[in-house]
Amino acid sequence: MTLKELQVGKTATILSVGGNGALRQHFLDMGLIQGTEVTIVKYAPMGDPVEIRIHGYELTIRLEDAGQIEITPAHEPHYKKKEGRQPLGDAQHPGYGEAGIFHEKKTEHPLPENTTLTFALVGNQNCGKTTLFNQLTASNQHVGNFPGVTVDRKDGVIKEHPNTRITDLPGIYSMSPYSSEEIVTREFLLQDKPKGIINIVDATNIERNMYLTMQLMELEIPMVVALNMMDEMRVNGGSVRVNELEAFLGVPVVPISAAKGEGIAELVEHALHVAKYQEAPEEVDFCSAEGQESAVHRCIHAIMHLIEDHAKEAGIPVRFAASKLAENDELVLEKLKLSQNEKELLEHINLQMEEECKVDRSSAVAGMRFNYIQRACEDTVLKPHESRERVRSRKIDQVLTGKYTGIPAFIAIMGLVFWLTFNVIGAFLQDLLQQGIDQVIVACSQALDAAGVNGVLKSLIVDGIFQGVGSVLSFLPIIVTLFFFLSMLEDSGYMARVAFIMDKLLRKIGLSGRSIVPMLIGFGCTVPGVMASRTLSSERDRKMTIMLTPFMSCSAKLPIYAFFTAAFFPGKGAIVMIGLYFFGILMGILTALAMKGTMFKGEPVPFVMELPNYRMPGAKNVGQLLWEKAKDFLQRAFTVIFGATIVIWFLQSFDLHLNMVTDSQTSILATVAGMIAPVFIPLGFGDWRISTALISGFMAKESVVSTLSILFGSTAALTAVINTAGAAALLIFCLLYTPCVAAIASIKRELGGKWAIGVVIFQCVIAWVAAFIVHGIVCLF
């Protein structure tokens, strides 16, 4: 019987995990090992993937992968507690990480006073790592409620300690090279060799989190364990005997609440101490030399003797390297540069372990780790009862991820977001701001006339700067409103459910459900959408997602849509806007289907993800994100757009002999843009001024509107140049043509220059063809 056949609400015990490679290792690292109890929680609305409960937390996997996990309804616990084993009781505080207790003054060897103490902040996804980073550094990194918010390393300085540098690394579950985040984190720890590690552990789910802790301890880097969410642990009736756990692990353990700022000072004190005095974790042998783990014990110690010299030359801790070789880690094996005879001996050692354990090598090592964790938790942790948040989340999920209600709920939520943004809240605030901007422009024009300012200077200030920048600023409310709703959806935990719901549908076009998140973020801005693709473990999926993200209309294009909708489709704003968004999605789907069979052949990455509890988005976090987005928009408005506005005003106001022109058709701009304009004649907008606006849009999409405002002066002048069919085609072209220079730069950073150039050309060709077809269809009516 396989896990795929188990009914909802039923529990079984895992007999074996099939498959091979990095995915199988990832399943083992997540706790899907022989003897573990697993419960089916629910199936996605489309029947796939499935949510399971294991080790006290929820995980989603596909039915295809569940079919490779052998189970039995009648189970025998994989680990049996030793007879006569007594809890440690109320042990005295071991004193790790404290001066004069762990070491003697006369034998200490502190680092020089001017040494910069570097720390790596490491932990599982969604365990409060970025919140702790903000507490430690007083910075304002965005905190989400979706696994994998941190997609790049972020550096900061610990408050009041200028000679420190702490790096917030992407969240990982183990030191196995499954995803790009795990590889980035592992390479940082092995190559950059920070002076200390702050390992943040979710106290409410300590068993799963400690799997990573054990591997970090093998790195022999000074380390402090931060037990986060202890406030939630206490509220739900749980507790941790910190002294006993510290003695068990051999590293300082500090209970904290990153969200409330509790225990941060003590954590910093211990971290600084272990780093300054280079107090590495005490050597702890995780596997017993007796009983069923003796084979693993002998295997790891034999490998340690075999590779000791090679590990030292490669700069890899011997115990860590031995554990990884016992798991068949190819990257570590490559770095050690073993001879052929040594490789054969290594294989013989592993085969001997498999024969004695009756399971494969990866399962044996993973089982050893979880057994040690189970022993530690039995003696030190009183598990909390099911939290109110978990109960509430389950009730909400009955609707938002229900079989018959999940997809309608998603459509309704996204429809409500767009309606409120474009027709209610955003539109109302935009009208208010536009009225204010108009009054400022009139007042400024009158003041300049009264002061007798030169006509050229007045034209620059009023027609160039105020008219151009002001036309863009008026759309700030719409952009902020859209980001507000996207932030609410992410912080609440709903984004993870969207990935769960949409996985089966996205798989039909060659993607994983996790790809929906970068694309949804792309509706706000393409740049973070491209960066968010780093959470995808497959290079194929990552490239494909990045290629499709520009089809998701970013918020910077909203001013263009609103401008043309008001001019050519009055009273139909919501219909046109939603239509454009859906058309972009449709083009993305068609492109994905084409790429699936050509450029990106193969299967999408497996869907393995946690579903976090729902929570109320924090006002501070949402406000911080909105401020960052508003500030970014304003900075672009007064830098890139401001500069582009002045340049366009100059090129439009002067001819090649630098004489001011009365007719802009004789200007420098008309001459240059006139060379490009014929390309757009078949699309119904071959005017040189529109070509100019599209070129300026490559710098920043918002500048399209400011450029048109400067060149045409009024909406009436624009409507006299193009008809409804041309306007529809222009909207489609603006929807699909090349992303802005910032987005292209982010694509270049992720995929390289050739891919970035390819995206520019590809998007422009797609945009031209789609606009040509739309223009022809509209002309028929």
Predicted segments, located by residue:
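Juxtamembrane inter-helical linkers in multi-pass membrane proteins
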Residues: 435, 439-443, 496-524, 601-625, ...
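Hydrophobic core segments of alpha-helical transmembrane domains in multi-pass membrane transport
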Residues: 409-420, 482-487, 565-567, 580-594, ...
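Canonical P-loop GTPase G-domain recognition
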Residues: 233-286
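Extended, low-charge hydrophobic alpha-helical regions
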Residues: 356, 363-367, 383, 424-465, ...
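Conserved C-terminal guanine-recognition region of P-loop GTPase G domains, centered on the G4
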Residues: 161, 184-253, 560
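Conserved G1/Walker A P-loop phosphate-binding module
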Residues: 92-174
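Transmembrane helix-loop junctions at the membrane interface of multipass transporters and ion channels
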Residues: 551, 555-578, 742-752, 773-781
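Extended helical scaffolds that flank P-loop GTPase cores
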Residues: 277, 282-453, 660-669
